[in-house]
Amino acid sequence: MFNIKKRKESITGIPPINVNSPQSVPLSGTLQSPLITPNSPNFVSRQCPFKKFGCSSFLVSKAEFDNHLKDDAQFHLQLAVEKFDHQFDLHTQLMAHFTEQMEDQLEKTMKVVRNHTDSLGGNVQTKLDEGIEKCMAFAKKVEQQQQQLAKRLITQQIQEKKSTSSPLVKGGISGGGGSGGDDSFDGANISSMSTSKQELQQELQSLSIKMKKELTELSDELSQKLERSTGNIDIKIKRIEGEVNEKIDKRQLVSTIDDSIGKKTDSIGYTLESSIIKKVEEKEKKKSEQNQLLFDSKIESLKDKIKIIETQQLDTSSEVRKLKLESTSSGNLMAGLNGTSGRPSSSSHFIPSSVSAAANNINKNEIMEEVKKVEEKLQKKIREEIDNTKSELSKVERSVKDNRSEIEGLEKDCKNQFDKQDNKIKQVEDDLKKSDSLLLLMQNNLKKYNEFVDRERDRESERLKLQDSIKRLEQNQKKIEAEIQEGNEQVERVLREEASISPISSVPKSPITTKRSSIILNSPPMTSQQSSPKIQDLLSSSGSSSVSGINISSETGEMGILWEFDPIINKWIRLSMKLKVERKPFAEGALREAYHTVSLGVGTDENYPLGTTTKLFPPIEMISPISKNNEAMTQLKNGTKFVLKLYKKEAEQQASRELYFEDVKMQMVCRDWGNKFNQKKPPKKIEFLMSWVVELIDRSPSSNGQPILCSIEPLLVGEFKKNNSNYGAVLTNRSTPQAFSHFTYELSNKQMIVVDIQGVDDLYTDPQIHTPDGKGFGLGNLGKAGINKFITTHKCNAVCALLDLDVKLGGVLSGNNKKQLQQGTMVMPDILPELMPSDNTIKVGAKQLPKAEFSKKDLKCVSTIQSFRERVNSIAFFDNQKLLCAGYGDGTYRVFDVNDNWKCLYTVNGHRKSIESIACNSNYIFTSSPDNTIKVHIIRSGNTKCIETLVGHTGEVNCVVANEKYLFSCSYDKTIKVWDLSTFKEIKSFEGVHTKYIKTLALSGRYLFSGGNDQIIYVWDTETLSMLFNMQGHEDWVLSLHCTASYLFSTSKDNVIKIWDLSNFSCIDTLKGHWNSVSSCVVKDRYLYSGSEDNSIKVWDLDTLECVYTIPKSHSLGVKCLMVFNNQIISAAFDGSIKVWEWQSK
């Protein structure tokens, strides 16, 4: 056996494989890998260690393992970096989410705190006012007591004076009778007076002391009470500040600093600065003085030493001179002794020459040595002293340097301290400024609160007055009704008697005599008042008399002056008129009442001169001298009915004479604009009714002494409708009235606009004109505010386009039209025919279907797709709903097989950051990410591949949708980009429409819908690549859009779902039920399914628009998106799970 193995080894060169050994690798009909070398027989096949980061390679041999680690090191590093970026992005998103929640909580807490501070401020003010009032009352009481005490003291003094003066008088009388008088009694009186004065003074002092004590005690009590109240208030404020500090940043502290604290801080800052400066200056002075003294002392000591050295040098020089002199004198003596002068001396001794020479030499050497020694000593001393002086000078220099360094250090310390103090002072100043601003805000809030309270009080008083007036009016109405009933009975009796006597009516016949006579007979007749002599003369004539050629009926009525405005000549035409007014008004408003009236003829004003009737308005230059060309002659013939509008007695004071004429003039100007509008040949012509002012001269004048005024106009028969209001609100769906308002604004060069259009069909009355300056045209002229209201709410229609107004059908291209788009002034397109067809034919809110029953069925989770512990941001179907694609927060997307129990087929690393949106068409899968890119993927022969990366956005790409021709993407850069799928290039970018981040897109047939943080939904045409319309209504970010049939469903961060009718772009209803942001919604049959961040899924019945079913905890975290699959609902959530829901019987 051993030999056989050796033979195999010798032949093959490969050792045999031990089948029983655990380290052997079985060969299942295949050859062994050539990469397995004999050097690594124990290597076990494994996956790459960077599998956690996304590397999917499987390694068989050690060499392959080493080569893979070397070659793919950069790839592995890139994967690790992407994983880190992804985790960082998750962290930042979570932080952003938490910061948003914290901001919301802060706003709520700030509102609570503001309300609390407002209530506290009001309570504090009331308490302070009460305390001040009590103090004032107490002070008044004290003053009254003082006055009473003073009066009592004065009365006591007067009484005492009287009592003391009576004995004096008696003493004087008795003294006068005697001889001489007695002065002792006067002295006693004077002493008693002085004592009484002293006693009074003492009593006054004691009273003043008591009063002072009482005042001090009262003031102390008041101060203590005020301190307690202020202490309680301070404690409450501190508590509130503590609560706010726990919830709010230090930047947003709501604390009020008093002026005294500011003054104290300022004084403390200044005293600190002054004290520090003084101390530093004193230290510097002391140190400089000490250094100068030391330096001066050292210099003086050096000078003394130098003087000593100089004296020593002088002494040595003098000694040397002496020695030299001695040596010279000794030499001279020796020379005299040795010389031969020839003068012998008897007393001289004989000295040999050798002895003298030796003596001379000894003396010279000794002297020289001594001199040298002295010089050496001097030099040594000089050197030592020089060294000492140098060392001392160096020490002095060192000390000077040390002092300089110390001074510099002190200066630096002082500067640092000054800087710190400056910073502290600046902080205190900033705090004071903040406190001042907060105090101002508090004061403003208190003022507003006080104003609000005053207004409420005024309103309450007005309400009480109105209630009283209403009660009085009701009483008067009851009385008037009783009187009217009595008058009607009397009139009926008289009419019956007249009918029995003479069957012919006194009213002259006209083309509509039967109708008019029946109405007049059925209606209660008016009582004729006293008329002027001229009218009585006219009425006394037979049958029908004439006034300047115009026939006026002889029937009982009242006369009036008729005023008609001609807008062409801009003047008033003055006429006379006879009319008959019913007693009861047939309609009434807030200020005016309307009466049915019959015309009895119109004539000239020759019998009524201007001086007797008109006083102030209109002026003479505004009155036309010609009165023939007028409308009253034709429209107010004898027997015609019209409406008379008269102000109520309560509103007479508010209505001036000019107001009547302004109203009529305004209607005539609008009538002229109606004629201009009709000249443009609109689909329907319009007309404003004629209107006149009438002075009822037969009636008693008003309280201001002027005749009673009223306005009249023809009677409208039919349903009265209001098309738009004075504030620009559109009240009906009719196009002609709105187009007329737009027409007047454009053709007047934006100098006026006609609104408040109302009437029967296209016969209008009571309009209102707004002008930029707000002048003229009555009290309803709102100026620029009224014009802006119309501009922001008006939606142009086909009539606007037919009249070639300032709009363009099919989109807007110019800058002015872009502004109109943003403001809402654009053409309302008809998009229903080219929306995506739908099998759902339900009418939203129709309430035509039977009530849905959920007692026998539940929406249950029938399957949960494998979770990968990453949030699911988007899901989409691919390949005719055979595959489900899901985009995850780690930058990958996974493909699941629908028919194989939702098995995960592919996991693809798509982006460095999370995949926010995924979309599919028949050929491609599109993914978008916060890395500002869009990637295009294909699935072929069991493999996935990224074929293109679209780069163009400068912000996070939030959403993508696609059809077979174009891809649409929206981003945080506030743009929507259009990509051509044949070339994968950008062909269009919509900019400047959305003003904030764009969050979502929805595609239906030809049209694209977009929404975002600016709370507006825009409609786009994908063929003309232009914007058509916008819809406003949400109060927060628009998060998702879903289009079904002719309806658009939008969800928002404001926790609601809005349903829009795309036929007129109006909001049908708002569904409220979720308590957090609604992230997605879909429609299946008659039900709307909505998912929210409150973890719930709700079911809404579109027939009744009610929530009929709720799954409160559908996921552990918020629901991100919903989709419909056959009869099932698929939901994806932030917890990483994907669930399939289905209705099942219980």
From Swiss-Prot:
Tell me which stretches of the chain form a coiled coil: 100-120, 187-241, 297-502
Which terms does the UniProt entry file under GO BP?
actin crosslink formation; actin filament bundle assembly; chemotaxis; mitotic cytokinesis; myosin II filament disassembly
| EC nos | 2.7.11.7
Query: What is catalyzed by this enzyme?
Result: L-threonyl-[myosin heavy-chain] + ATP = O-phospho-L-threonyl-[myosin heavy-chain] + ADP + H(+)
Q: Which InterPro entries match?
A: a-kinase_dom, Alpha-type_PK, G-protein_beta_WD-40_rep, Kinase-like_dom_sf, WD40/YVTN_repeat-like_dom_sf, WD40_repeat_CS, WD40_repeat_dom_sf, WD40_rpt
Identify the stretch(es) annotated as Catalytic.
552-852
- Pseudosubstrate/autoinhibitory domain as annotated region, ranges: 500-551
Q: Which UniProt keywords apply?
A: ATP-binding, Coiled coil, Kinase, Nucleotide-binding, Phosphoprotein, Repeat, Serine/threonine-protein kinase, Transferase, WD repeat
Q: Does the keyword Transcription regulation apply?
A: no
Domain Alpha-type protein kinase, first and last residues per copy: 564-808
Biased composition regions of type Polar residues, renumbered to the chain = 521-534
Q: How this protein is processed and modified after translation, per its record? A: The N-terminus is blocked.
Instruction: Return the protein name.
Output: Myosin heavy chain kinase A
